A protein has these predicted regions:
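Peri-catalytic and regulatory segments of divalent metal-dependent proteins
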Residues: 22-109
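Bacterial N-terminal signal peptides that target proteins for export
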Residues: 1-9
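C-terminal motif of bacterial Sec signal peptides marking the signal peptidase cleavage site
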Residues: 16-20
Length: 109
């Protein structure tokens, strides 16, 4: 009886882990698609900043943080980290599942 209970508990736990991994992968994929679409709109408006000192500084800090974020990632999935700097006086930044981020220059300037 105990052996059957342990086997059942293991099966339930394993299926929960497998299901959550599949869900995380789907969520990350949907987020990546939405991120690409949103960045395309912003890029078409000429609002992506890749060359200013602010953008370079944000990317520098971001690149230093990624290894620590990878260590803390407990999803079992690798993230494809991306950040885009948006030229705007707005005080804003946002992140999406799977390591997609946007940072507005207004937070730094």
């Amino acid at each position: 009886m105990k052996k059957q209970l342990k086997s059942f508990a293991f099966a339930v736990l394993a299926s929960a882990v497998i299901t959550s991994c599949a869900d995380s992968a789907s969520i990350n994929q949907q987020a990546a698609s939405s991120y690409t679409q949103e960045m395309g709109k912003i890029r078409s408006q000429g609002a992506i900043d890749t060359t200013s000192n602010t953008a370079r500084r944000i990317h520098h800090v971001f690149n230093k943080m990624v290894p620590y974020a990878n260590q803390a990632n407990e999803t079992g999935l690798e993230f494809n980290w991306q950040i885009n700097v948006i030229k705007s006086k707005e005080l804003n930044a946002w992140a999406m599942p799977g390591g997609k981020m946007a940072f507005y220059t207004g937070l730094v300037d």
